[in-house]
Amino acid sequence: MTASSLNSREKRAAVSLASVFAFRMLGLFMLMPVLAIYGQSLEGFSPIWIGFAIGAYGLTQAVLQIPMGRLSDKIGRKKVIVGGLIVFAIGSVVAALADSIQMVTVGRALQGMGAIASALLAFASDLSRDEQRPKVMAVIGMSIGMSFAFAMLLGPIVAASWGIAGVFWLTAILAVFGIFIVTMLVPNAVNKAPKGDTLASFSDIKKLIKHPQLARLNAGVLLLHLTLTTIFVVLPSQLIKDGLVADHHWYLYIPVLFLAFLLMVPIMIVAIKKEKEKQAFIGSVALLTISMLAMSAWVNSVVGIAVCMLLYFVAFNFLEATMPALVSRIAPASQKGSAMGGYSSSQFLGAFLGGMLGGYVAQTTTTQAVFAAAALVGLIWLIIAWKMQVPPKSKVISLMTKLDSEEHAQTLASQLVALPGVIEATVVRDENRSYLKINDKEFDLDQARKVAGLI
């Protein structure tokens, strides 16, 4: 076992926590391609209620995920995660037993109240060493992407056989599996990761809201997920109108998602190697906008929809993969957790607002107008992102620090920031820890440890 590889405990943590994440997100995503079709038998069905039901989890999750993360720091990660999964399972059962779209919406809101994302990520950080933490997070990130693709396959198949109720019952079962994994398979944490790396602080978030570059990214992820839920309010029904039966929708979704991933990877590699990240970012927002505009024109053609969705998901995948890394690079060294907390809340809020927008436009106008509205959202994002600044590549590390006084903390911060490769240094006396944003090519860890009095 080398220092550059995951140890057995980290591998176990990565796989088990990624599984919990995937089970939960699979349950949330499975509804997107089927509710607009199979929800028509529910009492009170209307496009605006479909949009509300699809996005309701986003509102409650946006509100509760940061408090749940803070609570996990006080009473323990496993308790909060298991409690959240129980609430998620209860919400799934409420929705499964519902005979009206309003009660389905209540169930979806309850699902979102099981807001365990922050606690899960903090737990993953607790169970991994500083230098291995990005790998563990990457495994979790991949599991979320895979769960979306699998949901596009599984949702239509399950709903075709057992209806909307079947989707929610399966979601409840997955939540129970998640509880088993957390209680039986996830290792117990011996240490806690630095708070600045993992947990959001409301006071820090208030300060970061004013940061122009972070504000652009928060607005961006909100608008990105707004477009996603907007189009899925009407897309499944439109595919049926165009002649693609409901249980065959995955014939379109899976090839599109697979090809979109294959096309996105070289774009990302070239953008990073050639240092053209901003150009690729702006280009992806433009591609997303154009794809939705084209969709509004080709809405009566399955082939046209497939081509537009391919372009949309190439852009979506690139932006979804790029923005968290940009947030980490831009965020102040000791406030990464708060920056990511604000970013995640914006993402969930976007899912809610997208459902509302898609439902309202579908109910008051036409399907074409829904896609045109999504294109307008993309245009607004393009304007917001135009002056975005991409910072130099960096990463954040933290060091335990022995501090005698506030003056000592300020002196140490000045000494650390003067070291080669240190872009920013923040010393937090309350935590006895120093957070460094560094250029890995120039930074000498032993030199920093020596200045901090660790060797």
PLM feature segments, named:
Residues 58-66, 148-149, 257-265, 351-352:
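Residue-level signature of mid-helix packing/kink "hotspots" within the transmembrane helices
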Residues 140-183:
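Helix-loop-helix hairpin linking two adjacent transmembrane segments in secondary transporters
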